[in-house]
Swiss-Prot record:
Gene Ontology cellular component annotations, sorted alphabetically: endoplasmic reticulum membrane
Disulfide bridge partners, by residue number: none
Gene of this entry: pigb
Source species: Danio rerio
Residues annotated as transmembrane: 40-60, 118-138, 206-226, 243-263, 297-317, 322-342, 344-364, 369-389
Family assignment from sequence similarity: Belongs to the glycosyltransferase 22 family. PIGB subfamily.
Location (main, coarse): endoplasmic reticulum
Membrane-related topology note: Multi-pass membrane protein
Descriptive protein name: GPI alpha-1,2-mannosyltransferase 3
UniProt-listed InterPro entries: GPI_mannosylTrfase
């Protein structure tokens, strides 16, 4: 009997030990929750990231590419206020209204509360983009926190926040910016090998939103979705319960929005891929050699992180393979297209930062030195490109804005921009119905070999174009806006027609081709002179 009792006690104690092991695992998860509240300079990491991105938004005061205005804010302004310029893409139906609709809702709210000032119309959408980027950064940190070690998560977050290209782009109203944020958020719910936070519904919904906003997001996500399909146990259910309903719903809602605003049934995503991929219309705006992304694109976008990213790739294990393959695949596919831009591969930058985090976490003796060098070498290009390079395109609109006071007068100002097409924003940064004209540059869609757009015709012989376009002084605009590189060539026209320089605004230290160092504003009539306080 005593032996039986002894055995019962031993059994009881062994059961208690099992329960203790379970409690131990709960303690580990509690530690994870504590790690998520990591503090930087005494500030919660989430709050810190938000503050960094808001500061980022304030310290980016330059222009990058025309699309950040002409394919978003300009269209939103037209949707709400009834005036704004539509480029050829909107006339051909290759742009969707889902993205501009987002800013149009903000504009409408500002209009309803009578706060639709130029400053808020420009700044509110950029704050939204900065907050979206901050949310994506926080989610990326939390993904790596549970997928890797806390050290890797911390350094991945550091790499992401100090990336000069992310700093330069994340607060801009570009479809590429939103595509990158949605791609990062989708990755946080993607079934990565060993991940604990995956949700097919969530990641596929975010991917579908990215595709609606920018159809080329499919390029980034094709290998990831294919990998998910190959590794999933129930492929039929994945197709019928995930891929099909989410894809159909997203495309259906997008088609309804686009058809409503276009006034006819239209499938924008197909038109976008047809023009940009199949017909390669983008080549009209410039072409690059096949290796450009490998030799220039990726090295510039990754920037000073490049050595650490390459080191991280060497340290990567099997579970990182799908991310590495996605970077290679995306770069290779975009390399097949003639027209190439840095922003096109922006969505793979967060993937690269994961490998950078792996590298810094592995470095022990050199970690502080590497992190310091990374911060310094990113800070310089981030501040220069954000505050100095190509700032004149925005500053000139600020200088011209006082002319809006006379927009409703019997003899309102008329402005002519003698610059490469879409060099500056338009009505979205003036917010008044002034009569504006600029040199247009739509591509030839008819296949003519001798085609020249209006901008090319003008720059081939500026004086001839001006004299034939304005044979009478009465037809001349009241103001001309041009780069200083054009000034000498049309100086005789300016003198003959009594144009006087009213403002000179710095634009860039690196003038190239038709783009000059400064932007000049000329006026014909003294009563139209711009306040001298605005002259830069």
């Amino acid at each position: 009997m005593e032996k039986i009792r002894e055995r019962f006690k031993q059994s009881k104690s062994s059961n208690e030990s099992v329960r203790l092991r379970k409690r131990s695992s709960i303690l580990y998860s509690t530690d994870d929750r504590k790690l998520q509240t990591l503090k930087i300079f005494g500030i919660n990491i989430t709050v810190f990231i938000v503050l960094v991105r808001l500061l980022n938004c304030v310290l980016v005061q330059t222009s990058f590419v025309p699309d950040e205005f002409w394919q978003s804010l300009e269209i939103s302004h037209r949707m709400v206020f009834g005036y704004g310029y539509e480029t050829w893409e909107w006339k051909e139906g290759i742009r969707g209204y889902s993205y501009p609709l987002l800013f149009a809702l903000m504009y409408k709210l500002l209009q309803l509360i009578s706060y639709d000032t130029v400053y808020l119309l420009v700044f509110v959408p950029r704050v939204f983009q900065a907050l979206l980027a901050a949310y994506a950064d926080v989610k990326l940190y939390k993904l790596i926190l549970q997928w890797e070690t806390p050290d890797v998560a911390k350094w991945t977050c550091f790499c992401q926040l100090c990336s000069w290209f992310a700093w330069f782009c994340c607060s801009r109203t570009l479809t590429n910016t939103t595509e990158t944020a949605l791609t990062t958020l989708a990755l946080c719910f993607y079934p990565l090998p060993g991940s604990k936070t995956h949700s097919s519904w969530k990641y596929l919904t975010l991917v579908s939103l990215a595709v609606v906003i920018r159809p080329t997001a499919l390029i980034v996500w094709f290998p990831l979705i294919f990998y998910h399909f190959c590794t999933d146990q129930d492929k039929l259910k994945l197709i019928t319960h995930r891929y099909f309903p989410i894809g159909v719903l997203a495309l259906g809602v997008s088609t309804l929005i686009d058809s409503f605003f276009y006034g006819k049934w239209i499938f924008v995503q197909w038109n976008f891929l047809k023009f940009n991929v199949l017909h390669n219309v983008g080549e009209f705006y410039g072409s690059h050699p096949w290796h450009w992304y490998w030799t220039q694109g990726l090295p510039v976008v990754i920037g000073p992180h490049l050595p650490l990213v390459l080191h991280g790739c060497l340290l990567s294990t099997r579970k990182h393979t799908i991310l590495l393959l996605t970077i290679i695949w995306t770069t290779a596919v975009y390399s097949l297209l003639a027209h190439k831009e840095f922003r096109f591969i922006y969505p793979v930058l967060p993937f690269c930062m994961i490998f950078c985090g792996l590298s810094l976490a592995k470095l022990q003796a050199w970690r502080k030195a590497a992190a310091g060098a990374l911060l310094l070498f990113n800070l310089c290009p981030a501040l220069y490109t954000g505050l100095v390079h190509q700032r004149g395109a925005l500053d000139v609109m600020h200088v011209l804005q006082p002319l809006c006071v006379s927009s409703q007068s019997p003899n309102p100002p008329e402005l002519l921009f003698l610059m490469p097409c879409h060099s500056t924003p338009l009505y979205s940064h003036l917010h008044c119905p002034l009569k504006l004209r600029f040199l247009e540059c739509p591509p030839d869609l008819t296949g003519r070999q001798d085609y020249m757009d209006e901008a090319d015709v003008f720059f081939s012989d500026p004086l001839h174009w001006l004299n034939t376009s304005f044979p009478l002084r009465s037809t001349l605009p009241s103001h001309l806006v041009l780069f200083d590189s054009l000034q000498k060539e049309i100086s005789s026209f300016l003198e003959e027609n009594s144009f006087a320089k009213q403002a000179e605004i710095f634009h860039t230290h690196f003038p190239e081709g038709r783009v000059g160092k400064n932007i000049l504003i000329y006026s014909r009539r003294s009563e139209m002179k711009i306040n001298e306080g605005f002259i830069l």
